[in-house]
């Protein structure tokens, strides 16, 4: 790595990295996913750092002084265990391995449970750490390690992850015919939707959250950090944002946060109005979490725009931050031309475009998901696969060869009318199907699929 090895596996980092290889190496992904599930504490939280000597069922935790002393991590982060939901879902949807839900895996410190049970406890961890508005508390950090929101401050980013977790767990509960739990999930998710719309929608953006003292982070009248990137993209990814909200929020991102190097994390940078938990103020304006272009966030932005059918924007965001697209300005970018950096200095920096922290980043995996699920539109679920490309208008055709549940798929997308998204006709082995969904039972050993946009 950029300055030596770490002393273990970061929980959120590793669980997210798995997502990018599921469609390529599903068995390797499954093995690593088992490992990370075994690093979940019995109350549902994830170990902030998983030791290289990890011994499932016998580990100490952040509640133990020995863990803090050895790892340097004194507390849980709000987002860690919530990354399990999309990763488990992507694995099962890609492979059809629904039996994985019933596989028994130990918890880090004691006890054991099925994968389905692990997910229930991950949801419980967030439910047991809610703030005054009923949103998940930010704890020691959410994805943004420079936001220290504590037990009373609340994170909208984590709230959108939480909302998405409900959606995924509802699908698993329905599959398992766990009717009482499914009914409870539906009620709780409806309550969460209401409070997120009531407390987090600010007319043309979603706020970033609340401080421990109850101040709003990221509303339109804030003198600094009035617009944040991740709440906008994750409101779309989670399915919480309606069409109008999504349009306004993502337009705000495009017109205000986007630069030729990608979208900055927030704007304006912190300088004179940072609250106590806004640790990003220690960085110069435009650097790292203080309004830099965080590379991993570009992957979520690609996916969000693609889910909305905005193929032009999705591909623009991909190109802006792609290492291979910047070889004509190596003297600006500085780092290697074949890898992502953690961040690129943003428009507030006198060195805009200079990138830093090579290799130590989850960007490659997240951008892979944004490209495969988003732009190419390969979106499997428990019953089959939806084909929903979101592409630039001038792409007249493309071909995809995909291994899927033991079958070989040859997919041709034709775009004679120059559209960004949509499906006018879908054929599978010459037979026309309604919509753009291919049920698993329609697949043969060698499947020919043609989608006309």
PLM feature spans:
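Conserved oxyanion/phosphate-binding beta-strand-loop segments in alpha/beta enzyme cores
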Residues: 1-4, 31-43, 258-273
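Carbohydrate-binding/catalytic loop surfaces
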Residues: 1-8, 48-77, 108-110, 114, ...
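Low-complexity, Ser/Thr/Pro/Gly-enriched N-terminal "stalk/linker" regions
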Residues: 1-6, 31, 35, 125, ...
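Aromatic-rich carbohydrate-recognition surfaces in CAZymes
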Residues: 9-14, 21-29, 33-133, 155-163, ...
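Short alpha-helical "patches" and their helix-cap loops
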Residues: 28-39, 99-109, 176-180, 245-257, ...
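Non-catalytic C-terminal accessory modules of carbohydrate-active enzymes
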Residues: 255-258, 271, 283-290, 303-453
